[in-house]
Amino acid sequence: MAIKLENIKIEKSWKEVLKGEFLSPYFLEIKEKLVCLKNSGVTIYPPGNLIFNAFNLTPFDKVKVVILGQDPYHEVNQAMGLSFSVPKDVRIPPSLINIFKEINSDLGINEPNCGDLTFWAKQGVLLLNASLSVSAKIANSHKNFGWQIFTDAVIKTLSQKRENIVFMLWGNFAKAKATLIDAKKHLILTAAHPSPLAGGAFFGCKHFSKCNNFLISRGISPINWDLNYTDNQPF
């Protein structure tokens, strides 16, 4: 059975530029694998309505920055469809703590007490995981589902059809995606992964100031990385 475009709950600009992917056989296979798991009682994260959350919060023509993760968090109540992000009132994971520490060092912004990165997404930061789903308690369990074909297409489409996007690639897995990006049109920033397992090699990368300096130099409004700022905002 073919997938019907009208049944895919994703922001309309993404549906248009990615419609060839949604209608491809591999995408139907992804859907079938997820349905099979759910029918067998496996819990999948994030919830189905949040699988395309990154795309719904950051339309195709609004993307300024891409931060690439590997796969969603696999513990209960963590995954929300945004790489590195966790919902309000959920304990901030170690990698995100280190991201906040680097922002503090780089820009002097106080570390927030909340790990919800929706504020970044609404400003144009596409928080993209290479795999968009995971089975509960099993990290990277959907890496061979076909999601990476889809998200590689997302990166290539952004590279080809847009310009002046900042791609932040952290860790060897993400760095390997640089081959999908036209470095003449975009800024590619690479660093060690923010995970504590990387031994602190992420610190000092200054990606957040480099990102904003690049955007400003291209006449594009910079990202406000201060999550504390959201308390007084109407969205």
From Swiss-Prot:
It catalyses: Hydrolyzes single-stranded DNA or mismatched double-stranded DNA and polynucleotides, releasing free uracil. One of its GO terms (molecular function) is uracil DNA N-glycosylase activity. GO terms for biological process: base-excision repair, AP site formation via deaminated base removal. It is an enzyme of class 3 (hydrolase). InterPro entries: UDG_fam1, Ura-DNA_Glyclase_AS, Uracil-DNA_glycosylase-like, Uracil-DNA_glycosylase-like_sf. It is found in: Cytoplasm. It comes from the Bacteria. Keywords: Cytoplasm, DNA damage, DNA repair, Hydrolase. It holds the Pfam family UDG. The keyword DNA repair applies. Its EC number is 3.2.2.27. GO terms for cellular component: cytoplasm. The keyword Secreted does not apply. PROSITE patterns: U_DNA_GLYCOSYLASE (PS00130). The active site is at 71 (proton acceptor). Belongs to the uracil-DNA glycosylase (UDG) superfamily. UNG family. PANTHER family: URACIL-DNA GLYCOSYLASE. This is Uracil-DNA glycosylase. It comes from Campylobacter hominis (strain ATCC BAA-381 / DSM 21671 / CCUG 45161 / LMG 19568 / NCTC 13146 / CH001A). The lineage of its organism: Bacteria, Pseudomonadati, Campylobacterota, Epsilonproteobacteria, Campylobacterales. The gene is ung.
